[in-house]
A protein has these predicted regions:
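Conserved C-terminal alpha-helix-loop-beta "cap" of PLP-dependent enzymes
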Residues: 103-185
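A general structural signal for well-ordered secondary-structure junctions
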Residues: 26, 60, 110, 152-153, ...
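Generic C-terminal helix-cap and adjacent flexible tail
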Residues: 186-194
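Conserved PLP-enzyme active-site core in the AAT-like
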Residues: 1-83, 101-105, 113, 136, ...
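Flexible, glycine/charged-enriched surface loops at secondary-structure junctions
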Residues: 14, 66, 85-93, 107-116, ...
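Glycine-rich phosphate/diphosphate-binding loops and the adjacent beta-loop-alpha structural elements
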Residues: 81-88, 165-170
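N-terminal, charge-rich interaction modules
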Residues: 91-102
Length: 194
């Protein structure tokens, strides 16, 4: 910038790997494990001399982690896939999750609907709201049971204390959504080992 202070953008789960750099950011940091769907890792894009500063931290005191060849190869492959595979649109996400939402809405004490990404990205998710009095369970306990089943199922649980969870359907097939529905249905019916 005009004062010689580098602009660093923590883009975390953003989907566009170029827009912030092209808009003038000096360094842009992305999570390798979120939208890119790679291993636990990160990706830094930016001006050469600032990236060199980041690389020096490899030998620094208190570095966060030692990167192994498996992580590098995993992230490299994930980025390659991310840049070459067709992206699913929000409308396609809605189409995929509509039967899932309809099935969930047939369950007593469950209300499901499509919600759009709060940051304005073209991402639709399934929001599932549980009436805890009707289902006679805490949402947090249900989320834990879903994680601990034969098929581990994880949700966005930022609002679990309000009885709300979200399903991100980008990497999930229609068949997998049906499996998730049957697990929720079984747990609501009191089957502990569903």
């Amino acid at each position: 910038g005009q004062h010689g202070v580098p602009l660093i953008v923590d883009a975390a789960a953003e989907e566009d790997l170029q827009c912030y750099y092209q808009a003038g950011a000096d360094l842009v940091i992305y999570s390798g494990a979120k939208a890119i769907e790679g291993p636990t890792s990160g990706l830094v894009i930016g001006r050469h001399h600032y990236v060199e500063w980041v690389k020096r931290q490899t030998n620094g005191i208190g570095r966060a982690m030692k990167v192994g060849k498996e992580g590098i190869l995993g992230l490299t492959q994930a980025i390659e896939n991310y840049l070459t595979q067709p992206k699913i649109s929000g409308a396609q996400m809605v189409e995929k999750m509509t039967p899932f939402i309809e099935q969930l809405n047939s369950l007593n004490g469950v209300t499901a609907r499509v919600v759009w990404d709060a940051a304005g990205r073209d991402i639709a998710r399934a929001e599932i709201k549980f009436d805890e009095a009707a289902i006679q369970q805490r949402t947090g306990d249900l989320v834990q049971a879903l994680k601990n089943g034969d098929v581990a199922i994880y949700f966005r649980g930022y609002k679990a204390n309000e009885g709300i969870i979200e399903a991100d359907v980008r990497s999930v097939s229609a068949d997998q959504l049906h499996t998730i529905f049957t697990r929720i249905q079984a747990l609501l019916n009191g089957e502990k080992n569903a």
